Amino acid sequence: MLQKIRFSKRSYFLRQIYRIASEFGFNPIALILSITGIPLYIYQAIQFRLKNTFSESNFSVSSLSPCLKDRYQGDSHIDKHYFYQDLWAARKVYQNNPANHIDVGSRIDGFIAHLLTFRKVEVLDIRTIDSQIDGMTFRQADLMQFDSLPIAEYDSVSCLHALEHFGLGRYGDSIDPDGHIKGLKSLIMLLKPNGKLLLSVPIGRERIEFNAHRVFAVSTIVDLTSSNLDMISFSYINDNGEFYEDMSIQEIPTMNYGCGLFEFTKK
């Protein structure tokens, strides 16, 4: 077990180095895969040109646009946190079929897109959205500020992989070490009594990796919500990107950077 934890930490450290390098425009994995793909690309380009001479179609090669790394990536480029959490939450909303649903800060091109296939949804985000999307109503709002928020208006609220960013300045929000606490209070305020909250956050050894995110101990989320919310289900994604649904919080393995998926009902 200790060896697995050490491997997990090393793996996470390497991913962090990769992420930081990518922030500065350098993607070492993409570079290696692209260089690896050059000989095959040249061979296939020549092969295609020769075969195209005898083709019945009228397509001609107008320019070269190399895609060198796609064949090597498989599903390794998929962020398992977002992939599983978006499916998990969309299925919950579909099953619960609330009269109205509002989302705070989740990905438009993931979870919100899933929801829009079967219902209308309202979205709050501190960032602006320029696109007009049928079925989606957008309002710019800072969830650390309570004065502009509707109170007890929604049957269902979601906030996926967003709460951990509140107050760290990453998305243009103000610096506030208690931003996650204020944000969680706002989520609870939005809910009607007996309304459902779907929440996902990074879980593991509690810490801040400034200004990327917080990582929460599961007990912290439980403590912050226990007076206003009842937890009705808990699922998680472990360090290996494996999804475990409807688990007991008493049986959570040690993780460095997992994802906790919480389903609550407002008291």
Residue positions per predicted region:
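Class I S-adenosyl-L-methionine
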Residues: 218-267
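Class I SAM-dependent methyltransferase SAM/SAH-binding core
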Residues: 95, 100-146
